[in-house]
């Protein structure tokens, strides 16, 4: 079972052979027994079994070289072991069905290399609950060295704007609402009264006219959060607030705006917010540092809370919905548990996540009102609430 051939070239030719269009040139002087070249797992995956009629033809030598190169390349992707094992199985099946290793390699090269081959294998990368948060480019735009694209994230943000504007336009057209409100007008009035009560309750020490200056901005923030958060509950849609950069940009812009309001109202005296009255002088530097860190972390906490709740909630619904879908196909004596139980689970989780999405808009708005109250009243908040 041993025969002579020429020396094998360096295995670095693997990358060139698979990812480029360079032809394979194999010069071998000695080819060991095929079991030396192919360990048990390789010979099983690629179905390389020596028989009594093997002769050292150039075609067989080239085929062995190609298989070794493919296996060495696959071995470099241990982090994607599941996809690599699937690739081995597919390649072995194609060879057993009559394709030559040279033809398989040419097909891999024509398809863009081994990376593309693995990625395009059906089932190589199973769908995960986090796939629903993937940002997918719809229209690619290149401006010089800048890469701009119209993505699904931008699309759903625009849809939210259009939906809110259309809702308020329908309610306020023809000079105002009806004396007997319909369902849409009742919804808008409910949002208006809800946000107005939050502003009046949470922001103290200001006249009604001054509070009205903050009301439109807070109302817009609440309305867009209210319509934006539950979007992910619609099948095949996208949750904008499930991305940390979006919520962080929103929270930082609000944080900067509130800080500007504080300086406009108090000037440099706004820094007294960092040092409560009556603090002993030795503790002042320590407390100023703590208050500064606490104040700056408000921007992070506002964004992280919304992002974490949306992402965790929607992921949980995805996971348990997949489990429920599997249970629906179980046919056994436990009919109620196997068929009706998962349906109730999905309905309950959907209602729960819908409530969480709406409540997060409420919590974010309350937090904004509290931060604005702190910036406008400084340390007078305690006396106001008392």
Swiss-Prot record:
| Position of the signal peptide | none
Bilayer topology annotation: Multi-pass membrane protein
Entry-linked Gene3D superfamilies: ATP synthase, F0 complex, subunit A
Q: Where are the transmembrane segments?
A: 150-170, 243-263, 270-290, 310-330
UniProt main location, coarse: mitochondrion
Describe the family membership recorded for this protein in Swiss-Prot or TrEMBL.
Belongs to the ATPase A chain family.
Q: Could you tell me which SUPFAM superfamilies the record lists for this protein?
A: F1F0 ATP synthase subunit A
What this chain does, per the entry, is described as:
Mitochondrial membrane ATP synthase (F(1)F(0) ATP synthase or Complex V) produces ATP from ADP in the presence of a proton gradient across the membrane which is generated by electron transport complexes of the respiratory chain. F-type ATPases consist of two structural domains, F(1) - containing the extramembraneous catalytic core and F(0) - containing the membrane proton channel, linked together by a central stalk and a peripheral stalk. During catalysis, ATP synthesis in the catalytic domain of F(1) is coupled via a rotary mechanism of the central stalk subunits to proton translocation.
Q: Which GO terms describe its cellular component?
A: mitochondrial inner membrane; proton-transporting ATP synthase complex
Q: GO molecular function: any one?
A: proton transmembrane transporter activity
Q: Which keywords fit this entry according to its UniProt record?
A: ATP synthesis, CF(0), Hydrogen ion transport, Ion transport, Membrane, Mitochondrion, Mitochondrion inner membrane, Transmembrane, Transmembrane helix, Transport
* Pfam families in UniProt: ATP-synt_A (PF00119)
Write out the annotated subcellular location: Mitochondrion inner membrane
Q: An example of a Gene Ontology BP annotation on this entry?
A: proton motive force-driven ATP synthesis
Q: How does it assemble?
A: F-type ATPases have 2 components, CF(1) - the catalytic core - and CF(0) - the membrane proton channel. CF(1) has five subunits: alpha(3), beta(3), gamma(1), delta(1), epsilon(1). CF(0) has three main subunits: a, b and c.
Q: Does the keyword Cell membrane apply?
A: no
Provide the organism lineage as a comma list. Answer: Eukaryota, Viridiplantae, Streptophyta, Embryophyta, Tracheophyta
Name of this protein = ATP synthase subunit a
């Amino acid at each position: 079972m041993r025969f002579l051939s020429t020396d094998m070239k360096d295995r670095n030719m693997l990358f060139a052979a698979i990812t480029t269009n360079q032809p394979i040139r194999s010069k071998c002087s000695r080819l060991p027994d095929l079991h030396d070249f192919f360990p048990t797992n390789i010979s099983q995956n690629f179905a390389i079994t020596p028989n009594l009629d093997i002769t050292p033809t150039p075609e067989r030598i080239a085929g062995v070289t190609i298989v070794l190169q493919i296996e060495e390349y696959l071995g470099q992707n241990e982090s994607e072991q599941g996809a690599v094992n699937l690739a081995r199985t597919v390649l072995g099946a194609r060879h057993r069905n009559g394709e030559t290793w040279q033809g398989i390699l040419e097909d891999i090269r024509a398809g863009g290399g081994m990376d593309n081959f693995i990625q395009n294998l059906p089932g190589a990368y199973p769908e995960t609950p986090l796939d629903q948060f993937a940002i997918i480019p719809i229209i690619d735009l290149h401006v010089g060295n800048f890469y701009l694209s119209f993505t699904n994230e931008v699309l759903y943000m625009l849809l939210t704007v259009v939906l809110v504007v259309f809702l308020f336009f329908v309610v306020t057209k023809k000079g105002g609402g009806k004396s007997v409100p319909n369902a849409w007008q009742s919804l808008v009035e409910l949002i208006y009264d809800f946000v107005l009560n939050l502003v009046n309750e949470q922001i103290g020490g200001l006249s009604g006219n001054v509070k009205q200056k903050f009301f439109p901005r807070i109302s817009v923030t609440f309305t867009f959060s209210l319509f934006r958060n539950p979007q992910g509950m619609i099948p095949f849609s996208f949750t904008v607030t499930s991305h940390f950069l979006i919520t962080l940009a929103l929270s930082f812009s609000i944080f900067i705006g509130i800080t500007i309001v504080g300086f406009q109202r108090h000037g440099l005296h706004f820094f007294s917010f960092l040092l409560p009255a009556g603090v002993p002088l030795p503790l002042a530097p320590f407390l100023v540092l703590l208050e500064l860190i606490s104040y700056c972390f408000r921007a992070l906490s506002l964004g992280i809370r919304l992002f974490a709740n949306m992402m965790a909630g929607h992921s949980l619904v995805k996971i348990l919905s997949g489990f429920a879908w599997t249970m629906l196909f179980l046919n056994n004596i436990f009919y109620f548990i196997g068929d009706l139980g998962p349906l109730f689970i999905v309905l309950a989780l959907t209602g729960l996540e819908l409530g969480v999405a709406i409540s997060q808009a409420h919590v974010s708005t309350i937090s904004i009102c509290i931060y604005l109250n702190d910036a406008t009243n400084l340390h007078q908040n305690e006396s106001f609430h008392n």
